[in-house]
């Protein structure tokens, strides 16, 4: 456990932001550099079958230390950080024994405030790792990587802890939805796995959104503005009309829990052509279909108003709710709950308002729920993590390996 914080602090200095416009895998050079460093670290640690493939996937195994059959289990985390905030020159700072109030982030005016982030009220006495206010932290998901490797280090050092075969993997490009694209499930050779990619202590998740991307294209007519009367059709105005037709109360800032949403995530605007990017999310497959149908209806309505087919919409499916693939295997969740309780961690089962590699892997034959890292406020400059949460995640991984082995001894 003594290497955990230092390991994490070292990992976050790697610039591993994924790049959605680059369709190579991995999408950024920094991920290749980080993958190589992890590969070398796992070799040095003494794990077996350590590999780094051409797509940047790092895998390794810890062989069983018991003399009876135990299903192989896996632990997975991702190497990339979100493109939503700067991930270069990350300078983490440790706040020891937090006692409340605003936390100054670096030398500027940026603060981490309990007024804006009430979770801080629950963390008095904890040791926090924050950003310096200029970048994200990268706890999502370098904390998961540090926790998995530290857990393997503990198991290697203490053969008295029984465990079956354990596979670990670190994936590229999860943040841009491609983390499972080249994942070799057969090579990984686990019966089930857990992503270590959740938030606060105790999170255990096996439900996630059904997800799709919608592209709305508005076609206009560009004419010199000096002679544009009755000729110009401004595609940006059409796009604005469409935006206002969408239900405002079903956007991310107005939804929570099991509520789905429409999220306008980007736009490219010009008079001649404007393009809107939406992400659609719903926990029910039929609900996602209904959201797509509503957008198609709004496009038809707007085209009728314009008296011409100037607007079109297309959809791309992203991932599905893993619930249907995990629920038939209740022992996967039960063992995780038992491991948490044994570590004095209260399991908090909740839906993931997003997706993980585990969602797609579950549909590739590898049921894969999600476990906490101890982090908060991912994807932005106010991201932070508690050292206690990281330590708890390590303890849960170790205990989960042990509980699985003991379960199959009976």
Swiss-Prot record:
As recorded in UniProt, its EC number(s) are 3.4.11.4
GO molecular function terms listed in the Swiss-Prot or TrEMBL record: metallopeptidase activity; tripeptide aminopeptidase activity; zinc ion binding
* InterPro entries cross-referenced by the UniProt entry: ArgE/DapE_CS, Bact_exopeptidase_dim_dom, Peptidase_M20, Peptidase_M20_dimer, Peptidase_M20B
Residues annotated as binding Zn(2+) 1 = 78, 140, 197
A GO BP entry is: peptide catabolic process
Q: Which residues bind Zn(2+) 2?
A: 140, 175, 379
Manner of cofactor binding, per the entry note: Binds 2 Zn(2+) ions per subunit.
Which cell locations does it reside in? Cytoplasm
Major enzyme class? hydrolase
Q: Does the keyword S-adenosyl-L-methionine apply?
A: no
Which cofactors does this gene product need?
A: Zn(2+)
Keywords, sorted A to Z = Aminopeptidase, Cytoplasm, Hydrolase, Metal-binding, Metalloprotease, Protease, Zinc
Give the catalytic activity. Release of the N-terminal residue from a tripeptide
Q: Which GO terms describe its cellular component?
A: cytosol
Top-level lineage group: Bacteria
Active site annotated at which positions?
80, 174 (proton acceptor)
In UniProt terms, what function does this protein have?
Cleaves the N-terminal amino acid of tripeptides.
Please state which protein family the record places this protein in: Belongs to the peptidase M20B family.
Q: What is this protein called?
A: Peptidase T
Source organism: Vibrio cholerae serotype O1 (strain ATCC 39315 / El Tor Inaba N16961)
Q: What is the lineage of its organism?
A: Bacteria, Pseudomonadati, Pseudomonadota, Gammaproteobacteria, Vibrionales
